[in-house]
C-alpha cells in the first residue's frame, strides 16, 4: 500500500475497522471459525478474496482461539493469466499457500457454445477441484469471498428465475458432505470492499471468462439493486435483515409450515393475520457509517467553551 496522507490514513483506518467488525460479527453469529480449524482461503485474485484474506489474517492475530490459514488459488490456465502475481504477493505476506493448476478453461471453451454463459460449468468444475484440494490439505473449513450484495443478488435470482425463496447461506456443508463452507464477508457491503481494495492497491487479476460476458441475469439483478440503493438508501440493509427474520407461517410454503393442522382452536400464530391492518413501515436502518462524510483531521476545529 502506498504512503497515505493523514486524512487518507484516517479514512482507511475507519473503513478497515468497519469491515473487520462486520466480518467478526458474521463469524461469531454463525460460529464460522472454531479452535483448531485449518481454513482454506480461496483466493481468486479479485477484490473480495484479497480483502477476505487480509481481514482474516488481521483477526487471527487477536482472536481468542487458535486457527490456521492457507491461501489457495486455482490457476485455470486462462490465456494471459499472470501466474507470477499471486505467488509473489503471498510470499511477501508470509502466509502459507498453494497454487493448484487445472486446465478448466479448455474444458469450458470446448463444452459451452460461443455466446453462452460459462459461469455454471466453470463453477461446478472449480468447486470439485477446491473440495479435493481441501481434503488433500487437511482443511476443516473452506472460506469463500462472497459478500452481502452477492447474497442478496442470489436471493433475487432464485426468486425471479428459479421460483425459489433461496439465497446464499453464510455457512453450509459442502456438496460432498466432507467440509464446512463459510462466507466471512457475509455482512460486508461490496462498495466498502471496493474502496478498501483500492486503498490497499491489491494486484487484482480480472476473470476473462465471466467478466467479459454482458447481459447476464446476475448483472441485471445487480444493476436493479444498485438503482434501489441509490434511490432509496437503506434498502439493501433492510432486505438482508429480512433474510435473517423469516416467518414461515406468513409465507406459503406448506413444506416449511404445517398449514393443514391449523384450525379454529389453534390460537394466534406469530401475530395472526395482518391482512386487514394498516401498514406501518419502520424507519429504514441506514448504516450509520454510510451517513457520515469522510473526515479530514487537518480541518478539525478547536472548540472553546464560552461562559
From Swiss-Prot:
[4Fe-4S] cluster binds at residues 119, 122, 210. GO terms for biological process: tRNA thio-modification. The thiolation reaction likely consists of two steps: a first activation step by ATP to form an adenylated intermediate of the target base of tRNA, and a second nucleophilic substitution step of the sulfur (S) atom supplied by the hydrosulfide attached to the Fe-S cluster. Homodimer. Pfam families: ATP_bind_3 (PF01171). The lineage of its organism: Bacteria, Pseudomonadati, Pseudomonadota, Gammaproteobacteria, Vibrionales. Catalyzes the ATP-dependent 2-thiolation of cytidine in position 32 of tRNA, to form 2-thiocytidine (s(2)C32). The sulfur atoms are provided by the cysteine/cysteine desulfurase (IscS) system. It is an enzyme of class 2 (transferase). Pathway: tRNA modification. HAMAP family: TtcA. Binds 1 [4Fe-4S] cluster per subunit. The cluster is chelated by three Cys residues, the fourth Fe has a free coordination site that may bind a sulfur atom transferred from the persulfide of IscS. Keywords: 4Fe-4S, ATP-binding, Cytoplasm, Iron, Iron-sulfur, Magnesium, Metal-binding, Nucleotide-binding, RNA-binding, Transferase, tRNA processing, tRNA-binding. Its EC number is 2.8.1.-. Disulfide bonds: none annotated. This is tRNA-cytidine(32) 2-sulfurtransferase.
